[in-house]
Amino acid sequence: VTVYCTSKYGCLALTHCGALGLAEHNITVNGYAPGVVVTPLWEQLDKDLVDIGFKEKEGQAYDDIVRDALQIKRVSYPKDIVGTASFLASDDSDYMTGQMIHVDGGWCIQ
């Protein structure tokens, strides 16, 4: 968990520092922070964690534990994230900089 949290905050700091450093060149720097996104890597991780007995509730897979912790009671799929990435790459976001958009089903407001 420590490495995960450190990397998330590293992305936030990089976004802020990049925005500060590049603003004078009229370059914007923003980011998005996805939560749990179901991909083949996530599906394998979920299976591996169940296989080694890592679960907080009896009979419940890690995927279910994460889903229960989200405000929106479902994990996301790549289709849920792509709109935010497209927005940030478009001219519609040209007046924002230094922002991190959390696309995490409410995880960060717990």
Show which residues each predicted segment covers:
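Catalytic tyrosine of NAD(P)H-dependent dehydrogenase/reductases that use a Tyr as the general acid/base
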Residues: 4, 12
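Short C-terminal tail/terminal secondary-structure segment
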Residues: 85-86, 97-110
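Conserved SDR Rossmann-fold cofactor-binding beta-strand/turn motif
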Residues: 28-38, 89, 102-104
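A conserved structural motif in NAD(P)-dependent oxidoreductases
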Residues: 57-58, 70-81, 92
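Conserved catalytic loop/helix region of short-chain dehydrogenase/reductase
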Residues: 1-3, 17, 41
